[in-house]
From Swiss-Prot:
Self-association and partners: Heterododecamer (2C3:3R2) of six catalytic PyrB chains organized as two trimers (C3), and six regulatory PyrI chains organized as three dimers (R2).
Matching InterPro entries: Asp/Orn_carbamoyltranf_P-bd, Asp/Orn_carbamoylTrfase, Asp/Orn_carbamoylTrfase_sf, Asp_carbamoyltransf, Asp_carbamoyltransf_Asp/Orn-bd
Species per Swiss-Prot/TrEMBL record: Rhodopirellula baltica (strain DSM 10527 / NCIMB 13988 / SH1)
One Pfam family of this chain: OTCace_N
Binding residue positions for L-aspartate: K99, R195, R249
Keyword Transcription regulation: no
Catalyzed reactions per annotation: carbamoyl phosphate + L-aspartate = N-carbamoyl-L-aspartate + phosphate + H(+)
Protein name: Aspartate carbamoyltransferase catalytic subunit
Length: 343
């Protein structure tokens, strides 16, 4: 991508018509690739000295987070600001939610202040879909319980593309369903409680990757086999086949009972360490959505080693969220204009 690319050269993809980003399961391969191409362009535009491009000046993004977040919340805020938009930061503690106000009423109150996007994270699956029905502004899912985390799935795929797939995927003639053809990606760890896993599973498969789901039987349902995914219960048996390992943390906060005898036993079977790295391909990519638990799903030598792209995932998160905000805003403006012309 030409580093001199300017904002007026950014073209809106005709395939994108969604005013909301709620999940990847219901997006097509072409729509997913459109977001990734836009993110790649915006990343280039905002690198180096030019940190901001005024594509969304005058608009406002509200972050309504009802669960803790470091990467996602700050990333959405930076994404909005780099495109010239303002942000509203909401925290459930100290708000009227503590007085009994409902989730939807809170969102409607924030919308009434004139916001253009609501970015929401909530422990209950489906809450972003509910808001999309209740609000007039754009809604982005920043994680709804164990259901999905679409921008995390997108940033993970963007990172893989930039490291493993040359530049052919940027060509409009590329077949979206074959972008990851021939590539094997393993998601390792707590699949049962991971919204990141679900977004990755749908997105990677739509773009042609072979996906392996690996983890303890208590955390990996055989339902995934019925849906056509490969399931494994021993990392040692698959690591040599993988082009990418995405290591998911154990989400103890979502579990009612411990799914294995001890953290030590889990690490012995599933942690990516130096010994397992020597069994892997020379160019394997090591990923993790964060936060990482050193010594549990990954050892420090691997997390900080040359195969790790964990911090690059964080960087790409800003690009993906810039693309998401821009695409949704334009799609809504186009839809509103069409509706006005018909009236």
């Amino acid at each position: 991508m030409d580093a001199s690319l300017s904002p007026d050269q950014l073209s809106f993809p005709a395939v994108w018509r969604h005013p909301h980003l709620l999940d990847l399961e219901r997006l097509t391969a072409a729509e997913i690739l459109a977001v990734l191409r836009t993110a790649d362009q915006l990343k280039t535009m905002t690198e180096g000295c030019r940190r901001k491009v005024p594509l969304l000046t005058g608009k406002t993004c509200a972050n309504l987070f009802f669960e803790n977040s470091t990467r996602t919340r700050n990333s959405f805020s930076l994404a909005a600001k780099r495109l010239g938009a303002d942000t509203v930061e909401f925290s459930s503690s100290g708000s009227s939610v503590a007085k009994g106000e409902t989730f939807v009423d809170t969102a409607k109150t924030i919308e009434a202040m004139g916001v253009d996007w609501v970015v929401t994270r909530h422990s209950t699956p489906g809450t972003p879909h509910l808001l999309a029905r209740e609000l007039d502004c754009c809604v982005l899912n920043a994680g709804d319980g164990p259901h999905e985390h679409p921008t995390q799935g997108l940033l993970d795929m963007l990172t893989i593309l930039q490291h493993r797939i040359g530049s052919d995927w940027k060509n409009e003639a590329a077949d979206p369903e074959k972008v990851f053809a021939g590539m094997t990606v393993a998601l390792v760890g707590d699949i049962a409680h991971s919204r990141t896993a679900r977004s990755n599973l749908w997105g990677l498969r739509k773009l042609g990757a072979h996906v392996i789901i690996c983890g303890p039987p208590t955390l990996v349902s055989h339902r995934w086999e019925e849906l056509g995914f490969e399931v494994a219960h021993r990392l040692d048996e698959i690591v040599h086949r993988c082009d990418v390992l995405n290591l998911l943390r154990i989400q103890f906060e979502r579990q009612k009972a411990r799914p294995f005898p001890s953290v030590y036993e889990y690490a012995a079977l599933y942690a990516m360490n130096g010994e397992r790295l020597r069994l892997a391909k020379d160019d394997i990519l090591i990923m993790a959505p964060g936060p990482i638990n050193r010594g549990v799903e990954i050892t420090p030598e691997v997390a900080d080693g040359p195969h790790s792209v964990i911090l690059e995932q964080v960087t790409n998160g800003i690009a993906v969220r810039m693309a998401s905000l821009w695409l949704l805003a334009n799609a809504k403006e186009n839809a509103d204009a069409s509706a006005e012309n018909l009236s």
